[in-house]
Regions:
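Mid-domain catalytic core of redox enzymes
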Residues: 1-96
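FAD-dependent oxidoreductase catalytic-site/capping-region signature
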Residues: 76, 81-137
């Protein structure tokens, strides 16, 4: 095993300057039914193939992701956050009561430190509502 003396100072410095803060805000949601997408409407109450994969929203164009990142680097949550949605109950229905589902949302970009405030309960609720409204569109 190497000690810090075995590693060049320039390398140690570059490693210590890496920002490991996460730009992701994860939201876990309990649903009383599967999401119904306009692009591929549900034909039954059973999961369809698109429910069984990762669903990406608000990333149809690179510019959308860039703007979300720019918002976060300015200390604001993204006005139109990129969303990765996973519905694990579409593959394993034992994770929720019959007819219900679990939805996992990985949203980007959400800065750890906000320029105009803190992540208090009200701010978290506002951000979650922004995400839900974005999904509903």
């Amino acid at each position: 095993m190497k000690t810090s003396g075995d590693v060049p100072e320039s390398y140690r410095r570059s490693i210590s300057n890496i920002d490991y803060t996460s730009p992701v805000c994860k939201i876990n949601v309990a649903l009383n039914k599967l999401p119904n997408f306009l692009a591929d409407p549900n034909t039954s109450e059973s999961p369809l193939p698109h429910h069984q994969a990762t669903i990406h929203l608000n990333c149809e164009e690179t510019q959308m992701i860039d703007q979300a990142y720019i918002d976060a680097t300015a200390g604001r949550w993204s006005r139109l956050p990129m969303i990765e949605m996973v519905l694990p109950t579409s593959r394993d229905p034992t994770l929720a009561p019959p007819g219900h589902h679990v939805c996992l949302l990985f949203t980007q970009y959400a800065p750890y430190h906000l320029t105009d405030g803190v992540w208090d309960e009200q701010t978290k609720e506002q951000y979650a509502q922004l995400v839900f409204d974005s999904i509903e569109r």
